[in-house]
Swiss-Prot record:
Subcellular location: Nucleus
Family to which this protein belongs: Belongs to the HD-ZIP homeobox family. Class II subfamily.
InterPro entries: HD, HD-ZIP_Homeobox_LZ_Class_II, HD-ZIP_N, Homeobox_CS, Homeodomain-like_sf, Leu_zip_homeo
Task performed by this protein: Probable transcription factor.
Pfam families xref list: HALZ, HD-ZIP_N, Homeodomain
Gene behind the chain: ATHB-4
Superkingdom to which the source organism belongs: Eukaryota
Name of the featured protein: Homeobox-leucine zipper protein ATHB-4
Keyword field: DNA-binding, Homeobox, Nucleus, Transcription, Transcription regulation
Length: 318
């Protein structure tokens, strides 16, 4: 066994002194392609000089070995180069930077689209606010008879603070009496009543609107209660009729029970009615007994039998 250092790397050679065979060298250090090729040429020249008779047989072996050595050395060199150079961190960052630049270019190239999107968002917000304001106006109209009435009740300040109309007892009494006479007022009546009560015409109109709404609501509640009572009565009557129908069906299925049943209705009369009915019966019975004459001495007609008719015919023939 021998060791040799050519200056290109540490190499080990295994050989046998007795048998003159080509030695197998193991390269333990990463070598460059030029060093490996030079070492391979040196080894090949040495083997050719020492053993010229076995060139043909050994050439194939050296070719396979050289190809394997070249592959392994190339892989090692690539790994070593990557290790020495380090990891390329800027590769992914460059791709991300390219994507960011493309996005910025797209935004810069289409300013009209950005402006249109912003204007569309503002338009949507304006529409939503307008819808909310319309709903609030409808709610105020349904509660107090319209926004105009609320402004008039506030005193025309327009500050948005709603104040309930306060009426004195005399004003409320006059309004109630007028409402009993006329549930609706024409413009002349409205102005006259407002001047009489020291109110505005719009306030009088709103009061009448609210009073009509309350009256209608009360009337609806009364009608609902009446209909509810009618529905309860009809339900009870229907239940009773269903019970009678079921009883009649049971009687129809069992006819032998008719004899044992009591009459469905029994009539009772008061004593005075019984005396009147008994006296009327006696009065009608007395003339019938007096007016029937009895005939004495006249034989009652008798019915002839067929045998008597035959005997009479025989007697007349003799």
């Amino acid at each position: 066994m021998g060791e040799r250092d050519d200056g290109l790397g540490l190499s080990l050679s295994l050989g046998n002194s007795q048998q003159k065979e080509p030695s197998l060298r193991l390269n333990l250090m990463p070598l460059t392609t030029s060093s490996s090729s030079s070492s391979f040429q040196h080894m090949h020249n040495q083997n050719n000089n020492s053993h010229p008779q076995k060139i043909h047989n050994i050439s194939w072996t050296h070719l396979f070995q050289s190809s394997g050595i070249k592959r392994t050395t190339a892989e090692r060199n690539s790994d070593a180069g990557s290790f020495l150079r380090g990891f390329n961190v800027n590769r992914a960052q460059s791709s991300v930077a390219v994507v960011d630049l493309e996005e910025e270019a797209a935004v810069v190239s289409s300013p009209n689209s950005a402006v249109s999107s912003l204007s569309g968002n503002k338009r949507d917000l304006a529409v939503a606010r307008g819808g909310d304001e319309n709903e609030a106006e409808r709610a105020s109209c349904s509660r107090g008879g319209g926004s105009g009435g609320s402004d008039d009740e506030d005193g025309g300040n327009g500050d948005g603070s709603r104040k309930k109309l306060r009426l004195s007892k005399d004003q409320a009494l006059v309004l109630e009496e007028t409402f009993k006479e006329h549930s609706t007022l024409n413009p002349k009546q409205k102005l006259a009543l407002a001047k009489q009560l020291n109110l505005r015409a719009r306030q009088v109109e709103v009061w009448f609107q609210n009073r009509r709404a309350r009256t209608k609501l009360k009337q609806t509640e009364v009608d609902c209660e009446y209909l509810k009572r009618c529905c309860d009565n009809l339900t009870e009557e229907n239940r009773r009729l269903q019970k009678e129908v079921s009883e009649l069906r049971a009687l129809k299925l069992s006819p032998h029970l008719y004899m044992h049943m009591t009459p469905p209705t029994t009539l009772t009369m008061c004593p005075s009615c019984e005396r009147v009915s008994s006296s009327a019966a006696t009065v009608t019975a007395a003339p019938s007994t007096t007016t029937t004459p009895t005939v004495v001495g006249r034989p009652s007609p008798q019915r002839l039998t067929p045998w008597t008719a035959i005997s009479l015919q025989q007697k007349s023939g003799r």
